[in-house]
Amino acid sequence: DAGRSILYQTARYVDIYKALEDISRERKLTAEERQELKKYSRLADAFTPLAKGMNSEYANQNTYDAIQVHGGSGFIMEYKCQRLYRDARIFSIYEGTTQLQVVAAIRYISNGTYLGIIKEMLEKEVAEELKPLKTRVEEMVKLYEQALEYVKEGQDQEMHDFLARRLYNMTCEII
């Protein structure tokens, strides 16, 4: 469900961006519309690598687990999970390896774009039964901020490159 949620959110950003782009071909955009176009273009660019990478990794993990549940026999031709497993492996390559998605997302991680979006989401009211989950996310965000600060303070490009995948995974887990 998390993968589907981020996919829908990304699609929403892309749809709004594309709609405004289409309108701009018909007429001149107002100043407010130009701001919206810029905002949603940035959000679409930021969320696309998260949606692709996260869903590719989830698909790989889920199909791997399906093979394990079948005791390995799910890998032979009679089972659908064999095809799904193969497709999931190819999907992550076709959509760009997860490492390419990390490279595409790291600037939005480093410049605080995702952190700002996460904080905006946390400002919203939630139903009473969801408050413990919100508290848990707030705790995760504190750790995320500490990790970001640690990497920024280090000012070591090798360390930054080494930790990029971990920061990407943290971002995906929180968003």
Language-model regions, residue ranges each:
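Flavin-dependent oxidoreductase catalytic core characteristic
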Residues: 1-175
